[in-house]
């Protein structure tokens, strides 16, 4: 049955929002490739890829090789719930199949022949598994691996903006970043010399690298420059040989004449592009130039005397008049020079070459080796192999497919994607592009553009760690292979998986990217999994990240949310993925667009990353369209390269999918986001994640439509994976029989255990409640049970309250909140929090600790709630200092008195010398015991409490199994009905009792008979062979499914009774869960969804609250001054829309209660909702369904106003008029204390308010006497340490200003760090002598010791009787003046 919801959105969104957790789940699935058959696993991806990069492992002599064949992941030993309860990691065992090949080597030929092959399956440790919610359970706590946003491998061109050198010259540079391997940097200095750095080491001229690659001087010049040829003729005349591509804008030295004598360019006139074309067309071969044209040009090759062979000049030498004369004398009449006169070609490469004195390839390679390995002297072979490994060897250098893709894209290359090393052509092309950039002063690449930043997802992060572990293991394997006789070894002798396990454990346990999941509510869970962090290993650090990295970039549109980011030092470094964004195979974030052709929006959807969006003209999602999808306006607002422009509709190429595609889910939950200031929207989206799930959830009257998606995808609800039927429902369990192939092993039947009083990571209480009934037919994607903070399948983090914006006696000062006592009385904002306390009994040197009820010197009253085993009973109400678990610890032997010795001698029993170390309730905790777990050693004895818990757990499992089996049997019976009902039975079937017959021979079977028969007895029961075959066909899988279920439940029962693996030295461990009910109290922090936060300052009786003319009081009073300066007007729009919704809902309920005709009610509903979908839904419903739906609207009509596509001002006014409210949103309120009307009309309405997890009960704290710091002897600070309040410098000034000297002395001595004074004070209070005697504060002694540590000896001298200081001349003068 659909819900009656008022939709204000106008844009139809054709693409569903992708599953919000796909990012995590798909990535890890791709890494594991678990369900993929061995033959189909992709060898370059995930785990398979990691094994293939490390294996085969050969020994140093190449006589043996260890090859990887395949891997297999087993079933986890414990399920998720058991791992959380026992503090274990949710992981699965892994086995790998490896092959050891031993070779015989022929020393003469060097060939190898296979001598022996051994293949073996080896246990290879465990691998943490991801839960279906996208989290990992590590040591019993749920953790999330946050995705990392980092610089993409590839090439990037940058310049310094003229900031580096004093000349303010812009210096260009380029950097090639691989996934693994050496970084390569090229940069120009202020003299235009090109330098190279490898791995950020000392720079050297870049031509050394070219020579090391095997290029000669001439080849370098030939690659970077085009050559021009000049003819040297008589009488110092010089002719330039014309080549069409070498146009130069010069003045003609002499008339340029064609073959017919026509002058094309006169002497002294410039050669234009038009005249250049005419010169080329006329076939003119050479143009006469000025005699000094060649001065300062550079030779393209060596010049030698043709007669003698003597070298006159080398390539790249500068041409001088003297050199020209020598060339003429030697009879050289043609000379080739480098073309550097053009405005886009400088002589920088030639200048670099002249600076570089390295003659050949060998010397160049040795020079590079020397720079990178300064300590070891190179030989030619070592240097050559080292250079080869730098960029050409895939074992040492990996660009990754992403790097190759970026390189091909930026340098316009066409290399295959599996070429993951650098080629010489890559390097030379990069330099060519860099030189061109410098010469043409082109723009640098933008490193903050999302085309240059990629996301490393969970799978990739874990894959990298796995590779590190395998490389460590590889070293150990190689050493083992060389140390022992290889022919006698088996593969398992070589492989030790411990290094891999250690690396994984470290990553999941302590990495900066493996975080304790934020589990305050369902939204905080989802947003944590969709978070992108620029921090972490290989990323930025908070301190070094500048403003540019943190800022919003135009390429973020539709990919990264510009709103949701933390306030404080991490702002802009931790961001969130937008609603529709996906991450592609290369790790770049993509956003979807509709393709637009000739002004018509098509249904075709394109997912584009930021670099492919480059020149596209993108229209906004709210551009007006006609019925056929054509753009209505001739000129449309579009985005081009991040800039907003107006373009003709025919130029538009793409269109946004939805207005909400530019914000994250958290921001998309804020109605009227478009009317809020960005800073407040940021606070609003962050504070929704801090909302505590309340005792009774209530969905917002004003929502955005995203609530359903968040609730469904969060994992907090139970969602049907396929169509099916509800077989059984109670508060703890739902059993569903599904159609199709889901849960095939269990016969399509799945039993869900609902969470009850589950403690979340943030100590909030998670529980699920069923939202279905037995016999109900459910569809795929339907919600079967609501989770915490979810109401009717929608996210519901707060409550709808009637709000008034008005000052009230100063109780709203500085954003304070005045709230009605009704919210406390009716538990509107009551939440449950669960605290866990743990006690451990250990084996000590003096004997074992014991958990017992028998505690010395403790009254029976203190023990009243403990059972025989000394553990508190479930349901007991506890308060601070109550005993939860009784425990005694043996004390050291003490000297016995003669009397005690006598008693021991008489009674023989050694009187127990133990101290009470029981677990007590800490201060500030008051609640009810809801759960106790006892963990015993496997071999240890079990106490009564453990046996009782085991008995209860086993009974619950038995009941579950019975329900599951019943559902499976009913499902099988339903399948049998069409085959067996009405068919004749071959033989009579006896019952369990003596003489009882269930079915007579020859009788036709009815449905009633079938219901009473055991299903297994139907095998071979019928006369007809076809019927028996059909029955056998159905019963065969049934038997397998029954066996499978029995095996599962038997294993669970075994686990209940088998005992636990406890840490060494631990005998027993007890965990106690206390549920604490926290009602709203003064000091609690509350907030709306628009960043309007405040602290409750007063809880006022209902009768004193301002009230409406009809006597209804408002629930909450907010300060009107909090709105204008903060510019979050969205809250006012929400208030007005919510008021209309509540009022209309109330009117409909009155109509229903007054017994109005059904048709009248239907027409009223249709006119309010005015939507074709709702009209159809209303017509479909029968009267009972319709009544139930209208009754749900009693507290208000749920409205949806999507972000950037919500209700307009006009729509809100007409909605309020429809409800009979004033269209300015104000009304007259009356003072609850006097009954008089307030002077001005007040803005009132309904606002959705949240209670945040900053609760006063968890922060308030008081200290009497407590722990002191060891060195300074001052009280510790903070609630966790039971510390005191610090009296700082400014507080001392305040007391000095009041002249409160004795008070100050008391604060700074006996109440703080005067050790002897503290003891004396105590004694005096005991004696009733309240006189302060302060001593020396310990901090003075600390100061003295610190001075001593500086070598200054400070000693204190007590003066006998104070002597008057000697009067100096200066003092005499001062006294005389006085």
From Swiss-Prot:
PROSITE patterns documented for this protein: RNA_POL_BETA
Keywords carried by this UniProt record: DNA-directed RNA polymerase, Nucleotidyltransferase, Transcription, Transferase
Keyword Nucleotidyltransferase among UniProt keywords: yes
GO biological process, one term: DNA-templated transcription
Catalytic activity: RNA(n) + a ribonucleoside 5'-triphosphate = RNA(n+1) + diphosphate
Keyword Transcription regulation found: no
Subunit structure: The RNAP catalytic core consists of 2 alpha, 1 beta, 1 beta' and 1 omega subunit. When a sigma factor is associated with the core the holoenzyme is formed, which can initiate transcription.
PANTHER family in alphabetical order: DNA-DIRECTED RNA POLYMERASE I SUBUNIT 2 (PTHR20856)
Protein name, per record: DNA-directed RNA polymerase subunit beta
UniProt source species: Desulfovibrio desulfuricans (strain ATCC 27774 / DSM 6949 / MB)
